[in-house]
A protein has these predicted regions:
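Short secondary-structure junction motifs
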Residues: 20-22, 76, 80-82, 173
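Catalytic-site signature segments of enzymes, centered on catalytic residues
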Residues: 35-36, 53-55, 99-103, 123-223, ...
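Catalytic loop of the DD-peptidase/beta-lactamase superfamily, centered on the K-T-G motif
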Residues: 1-42, 53-57, 87, 174, ...
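Active-site helix/loop module of the DD-peptidase/beta-lactamase fold
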Residues: 52, 57-61, 75-129, 188, ...
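Active/ligand-binding-proximal structured segments within catalytic/core domains
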Residues: 65-66
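A generic structural signal for nonpolar/aromatic side chains embedded in well-ordered alpha-helices
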Residues: 114-115, 156-157, 283, 375
């Protein structure tokens, strides 16, 4: 591993935040000259110590995995990204998900709408019904609870409203609104097309080709109770969050720093795809910028100036926000619990990590500039982990 005191300082600053109880992060260059990992804090209250090999919940980084599996199947002819959702799932199952002013536009929604967040569908997890709490707020306030895919869809149908009509799919100026409903539906599509579980699809189409041996998915049918006993705790403010039933309902994914490095590098280089890097380039085109949200949910989900393509984020600050030391752009994905996988093309760097805090979704974006500056000053001396 590489000795990197500047990155150690970044790690310590994150751990020093009042809302961060542990942190694990890694940075590696394409040529291996910089290869650093570090961890601080305990796995859970009372120990043991968190290590750079401890599995953790990756949150919405699973969207990058879902998109990768989708593109693998598309280039093999198993599905068509421009095919309608109702061609892959029972029309009765999805009917009424996108109704505005009495008009049901659900049948216009394609898989491409879902994977690019241009469907306009409400977010079953984060959006609030009129006079009520979001599903994630209910979980945080009332305790662990579970639901089926169809129960989540019924919530969208009966209690929430779409944000905008389904957009013109290939229009670079199309509206984009982050919604967990989009990718919940895509997971159902993956299962319908392959007649396999989501976990099996991920394992066969993504994890195995990329050598991700320590990544697993929990679900209502496959709880992985023994493996869950060893994962890093999630936190909600000052309290640990024990929500195994909720995590199984969302097909929660757990991984390690090493596997997340393998994921971001492998996808960017196109290793799972028959078309190689050219397929990834299609995933990453076009990028559209999220709008500015002003509701409570906007504090947790990605917004301006983050851009989105097909399950891939890009983050680059507008020049007017950083006129003198603008950090280079990164692509990858983040999660609402303060998780990140970033690839920086200009520096050929991969950056991954977690703070496991449900209030820390913005942390990766706020810290990225400091991390990239630290990598410029890091000397390639070979030593142990941080």
């Amino acid at each position: 591993m590489t000795r990197a005191p500047e990155l150690e300082a970044c790690l310590d600053r994150l751990w020093g935040r009042r809302d961060v109880h542990h942190v694990a992060m890694a940075v590696r260059s394409g040529d291996g000259a910089l290869d650093w990992r570090g961890a601080r804090g305990d796995v859970r209250p009372g120990g043991p110590a968190l290590t750079t090999e401890t599995p953790y919940f990756v949150a919405s980084i699973d969207k990058l995995v879902t998109s990768t599996a989708l593109f693998v199947l598309a280039e093999r002819g198993a599905l068509d990204l421009d095919g309608r959702l109702s061609e892959y799932l029972d029309p009765a199952r999805v009917r009424g998900l996108h109704v505005a002013r009495g008009v049901d536009r659900t049948d216009e929604i394609t898989l491409r709408h879902l994977v690019s967040h241009t469907s306009g569908l409400a977010d079953y997890l984060e959006d609030r019904p009129k006079g009520g709490l979001s599903l994630i707020e209910e979980t945080l306030q009332r305790g662990d609870a579970g639901w089926t895919v169809d129960e989540a869809l019924e919530r969208v149908r009966e209690r929430l409203r779409p944000h905008f009509p389904p957009q013109v799919p290939h229009d670079p100026g199309a509206k984009v609104q982050y919604s967990d409903t989009n990718f919940l539906l895509l997971k159902a599509v993956l299962e319908a097309v392959t007649e396999r579980s989501v976990a099996d699809v991920y394992r066969e189409r993504v994890f195995a080709p990329l050598g991700m041996r320590d990544t697993f998915v929990v679900s209502r049918d496959d709880p992985h109770s023994e493996r869950m006993a060893n994962v890093a705790a999630l936190w909600a403010g000052a309290e640990p969050l024990d929500a195994p039933v909720t995590l199984r309902s969302t097909y929660g994914m757990f991984s390690t720093l090493n596997d997340q490095l393998a994921l971001v590098r492998g996808v960017v280089e196109g290793r799972p795809f028959e078309g190689g890097r050219a397929t990834f380039e299609r995933m990453a085109t076009p990028f559209r910028r999220f709008g500015q949200g002003f509701d409570r949910a906007a504090l947790r989900r990605p917004g301006w100036p983050i851009e989105y393509a097909h399950g891939v984020m890009r983050f680059r600050l507008p020049r007017w926000l950083a006129p003198f030391d603008r950090p280079p752009a990164v692509v990858g994905h983040t999660g609402s619990t303060g998780t990140w996988v970033f690839h920086c093309p200009d520096r050929d760097l991969d950056l991954v990590g977690t703070v496991d805090q449900v209030t820390a979704g913005p942390v990766p974006f706020r810290s990225l500039g400091a991390w990239l500056r630290a990598t410029r000053r890091s000397a390639p001396n070979r030593v142990a982990d941080g």
